[in-house]
Regions:
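Metzincin-family zinc-dependent endopeptidase catalytic domain
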Residues: 1-145
């Protein structure tokens, strides 16, 4: 692993002092040193992730891909939602249940690879789309962890909605899958310029 200047690195950069900001919003200030955050490393060579005290009840957010890579490309994660308490490394008191299995990062980075929310952002109208034919129509985000099958106003009969899909807002212990169409969309981004450079990066 190397920094943009070729030095050995763990991939971690921290900034705890020299800023009066105690929480951050979705205005991307956390992605700029001049605004109290940290500048991105070359986004064609690194997948950037900013971890901070994110305000407004948000767990995290990701930036969608564009024809030319934005210098802010990456994800922002609220610090209690980073990491997992279910690995061989043990448990960490700062990670908050029920978002303690790393699914927030997984969900946010999926946006970077062109995956949309299951419900199509149509406010329950059942007319929106996530552009994946193999995900059931869904009215809105879910929370908690339902028993299977679970129906809603857009998928009224069994098997209902796919609340286990990583692009829903269910608890981390529920989120365990992507569909083939979602995989195809992600690979299409990763295999196309300029994002394909990430596959051969020495970062």
């Amino acid at each position: 692993q190397q920094t943009p200047t070729g030095l050995a690195t763990t991939g971690l950069e921290t900034r705890q002092y020299g800023t009066s900001t105690t929480s951050w919003s979705t205005n991307d200030n956390v992605k700029h040193y001049a605004n109290g955050g940290l500048d991105a490393w070359d986004p064609t060579r690194y997948l950037n992730i900013w971890v901070c005290n994110l305000s407004g009840g948000l767990l995290g957010y990701g930036e969608f891909p564009t024809a030319s890579v934005s210098q802010t490309f990456g994800v922002v994660i609220d610090y209690p939602c980073l990491g997992s308490n279910y690995t061989s490394y043990g448990t960490f008191s700062g990670i908050q249940a029920p978002f303690d299995r790393g699914r927030t990062v997984q969900h946010a980075f999926s946006h970077c690879f062109h995956i949309y929310p299951l419900w199509g952002d149509d406010n329950g109208a059942c007319s929106g789309s996530d552009l994946c034919a193999d995900t059931p129509n869904q009215g809105d985000a879910t929370s908690g962890c339902f028993a299977y099958p679970h129906t809603d106003n857009c998928s009224t009969t069994s098997p209902g909605i796919m609340f286990e899909n990583s692009m829903d807002y269910s608890d981390d212990n529920c989120l365990n899958l992507f569909t083939n169409n979602q995989k195809t969309r992600m690979l299409a981004v990763l295999n196309s310029a300029p994002y394909n450079a990430l596959q051969t990066s020495n970062g």
